[in-house]
Amino acid sequence: MYEIKQPFHSGYLQVSEIHQIYWEESGNPDGVPVIFLHGGPGAGASPECRGFFNPDVFRIVIIDQRGCGRSRPYACAEDNTTWDLVADIEKVREMLGIGKWLVFGGSWGSTLSLAYAQTHPERVKGLVLRGIFLCRPSETVWLNEAGGVSRIYPEQWQKFVAPIAENRRNRLIEAYHGLLFHQDEEVCLSAAKAWADWESYLIRFEPEEVDEDAYASLAIARLENHYFVNGGWLQGDRAILNNIGKIRHIPTIIVQGRYDLCTPMQSAWALSKAFPEAELRVVQAGHRAFDPPLVDALVQAVEDILPHLL
């Protein structure tokens, strides 16, 4: 990764009556614009996210999406949909006076990157996508319902289902929704920790015991659940795949961990079949972007796409 430099410009943008989103710029003010779209939904961005981009070459824009990270109010699901986030990205672009930019997103960030590019293809110079997630029911069931990745880590799955009454475990995402939006804050926080611990375990190539902070877990747990319950506000399983025609001309590199248990290879494969113009690069790695094999592959992908952006 590149040196993590401090932002030269940052602030908050009022994007609705309720929400203010945090934004920042780092790197070269006159460089090639790139926006980093974090995962989750609800994960927020960290300073380390700047490290995928050469700060001498890129004007690096990072935002925390509605309800998470440094954005306000925290863990708020009201007025918080995929299309709200797409509109927010455009508002940030317009505020910063950027004509076109490279869009970089992983996991949920790949969903949002594709949704944004298909809505505003004229504003996208290129796409670098990692850990493809298309927000299809089959993907959310794999993650958070019995019979998917639960078969690989049954001992951790037992902890994930523990907050849910046995007679409600046939629809876990729905059952968790009731807990994560419960009026009792302690109920919300306990459920959020169980949800986030499960996901944190899955994203590591070499799993280790995790113990996430309950309050810090609330945004990712509540917002992921909110989006999953609502199908990401996408029209059907193939909503993104059926609109690839809008972005075929955009240079695109897909980086996918072969052993990714959070966003399995199947979705990257489906995207590459629908979008053969994109280059699919499979790495011997899991899901977490900061694991060394994925870091190297992502830095290389950004370097390789750069000539197409100039």
From Swiss-Prot:
Gene Ontology terms: cellular component: cytoplasm
Pfam family name, one: Abhydrolase_1
GO terms of molecular function: aminopeptidase activity
Keywords for the protein's UniProt record, in alphabetical order: Aminopeptidase, Cytoplasm, Hydrolase, Protease
Reaction(s) the record says it catalyses: Release of N-terminal proline from a peptide
Keyword hit for Cytoplasm: yes
Subcellular location(s) of the protein: Cytoplasm
InterPro entries reported for this sequence: AB_hydrolase_1, AB_hydrolase_fold, Peptidase_S33, Pro_iminopeptidase
EC number, as in UniProt: 3.4.11.5
Primary location class: cytoplasm
The keyword Repeat belongs to this UniProt entry's keyword annotation: no
Record-annotated active site: S107, D260, H287
Its job: Specifically catalyzes the removal of N-terminal proline residues from peptides.
Name of the protein in question: Proline iminopeptidase
Organism (species): Neisseria meningitidis serogroup B (strain ATCC BAA-335 / MC58)
Gene this chain is encoded by: pip
